[in-house]
Curated annotation (Swiss-Prot):
This protein's name: Orotidine 5'-phosphate decarboxylase
Coiled-coil annotated spans: none
Taxon lineage: Bacteria, Pseudomonadati, Pseudomonadota, Gammaproteobacteria, Enterobacterales
UniProt source species: Klebsiella pneumoniae (strain 342)
HAMAP family noted in UniProt: OMPdecase_type1_B (MF_01200_B)
Enzyme class: lyase
EC number(s) recorded for this UniProt protein: 4.1.1.23
Record's keyword annotation contains Lyase: yes
Xref: Gene3D superfamilies: Aldolase class I (3.20.20.70)
Gene name in the database record: pyrF
GO biological process: 'de novo' pyrimidine nucleobase biosynthetic process; 'de novo' UMP biosynthetic process
Amino acid sequence: MTSTAITSSRAVTSSPVVVALDYDNRDKALAFVDRIDPRDCRLKVGKEMFTLLGPQFVRDLHQRGFEVFLDLKFHDIPNTTARAVAAAAELGVWMVNVHASGGARMMTAAREALLPFGKEAPLLIAVTVLTSMEASDLQDLGITLSPADYAAKLAALTQRCGLDGVVCSAQEAVRFKQEMGQAFKLVTPGIRPQGSEAGDQRRIMTPEQAQAAGVDYMVIGRPVTQSADPAATLRAINVSLSKEA
């Protein structure tokens, strides 16, 4: 089985930056995308954009050379989640995610759904604890563990289920790399260059701090999308990361 998207036209990037596209309008989103280079980043499409614009928007990004992280955080019964993950693979996305709290059977079903795609399968990662959540939020759900300990528990479960990695906060990256090894991918939202506002993220780091902590892919939104010169902002971030490497 192969994905329907044409992969040969996509740019190959070594950048760990994934730009979060948070637009409610296709034309505005593509106007931004056309100002940046697919060699400088990948793009993240989340629930709002995918609900509004559908799979064709992902194809539009592919046609412009970008690899896409489809951030839909699937969380359902195992069979439904597996079918959704397979549909994402058919679309040709680079990465797709599920909620680790969906449990072992759900995550295993999702992983097995990607086996027919072979080397063309997207990376499959799991969300541990949302970066907006604090200890008090978990306590409201009856979870007495700290965000870090709960995330570690879910990350260990994710690895046992054979997924490629997890979404986690940068603060947890050092611990996860030590406990789960370098091959286990860490994807971190809430990354903001020095001087950026925190917004609705609570556990944030700069790109340089995240890289030093062991983050493999860092999601950056408004500091790039709201920049007067997003291409220059991306280049500056990548240069700063290459100096730290």
